[in-house]
A protein has these predicted regions:
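Conserved functional hotspots at enzyme active or ligand-binding sites that engage polyanionic ligands
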Residues: 1-190
Length: 190
């Protein structure tokens, strides 16, 4: 290998490293700004909780209900911002605790496809099948309160304060709650 070729490769590697570092620094600055932008709302919600703890704890939340939830700004792949969630904790917990267990919804459906053609694999009803066993699809044509076809991401199940929950959008039927339970059991290894 000649010297010029060696130096060209080293130069390219160095340029790629500078580019990665530049993207990393930009991502850090952006995340810092997003967290600082979220802080005033987070403080407002925390103060509201302190002032209204008893009424928040007694808020009537039902298993299978879909609400908007303000997740704020978080780290890594954790859910961020305001998004719909399904309340999955049992109604005893829901009526006595200041927190509830929720499954976040996303409009980004990851669909199972045939390996050779890339075409979606569909149910007998013509609906796409989730790529991941931990996801369960909820369709707008069944739940018109949803703005989009949505995936319930059971691997992202988390406990949130009721103060984070906003508008009640609607509720899932028992069949879909049961199917969500199956995915939850798989996600938690139960």
């Amino acid at each position: 290998m000649n010297k010029e070729h060696e130096h060209g490769g080293a130069f390219r590697a160095s340029a790629e490293k500078r580019e990665r570092n530049s993207r990393t620094e930009y991502a850090k600055k952006l995340k810092t700004k997003q967290i600082y932008d979220w802080l005033p709302l987070q403080l407002e919600m925390a103060h509201h909780w302190i002032e209204h703890e008893k009424t928040q704890t007694k808020r009537n939340m039902a298993r299978g209900a879909v609400h908007f939830c303000q997740f704020g700004e978080n780290i890594g792949c954790e859910q961020n911002e305001e998004r719909p969630v399904v309340i999955i904790s049992n109604n005893t917990v829901n009526s006595t605790s200041g927190n509830v267990l929720v499954i976040p919804l996303t409009k980004n459906l990851k669909i199972r496809t045939f390996p050779k053609t890339g075409q979606p694999i569909l149910t007998k009803e013509g609906n796409p099948i989730p790529r991941f066993q931990s996801h369960y699809f909820l369709f707008k044509n069944k739940y018109d309160f949803l703005a989009f076809d949505s995936a319930a991401k059971t691997e992202e199940t988390t406990s949130v304060s009721k103060i984070r929950l906003k508008d009640h959008l609607g509720s899932l039927d028992e069949e879909d709650i049961s199917r969500l339970e199956t995915r939850l059991k798989w996600s938690f290894g139960l």
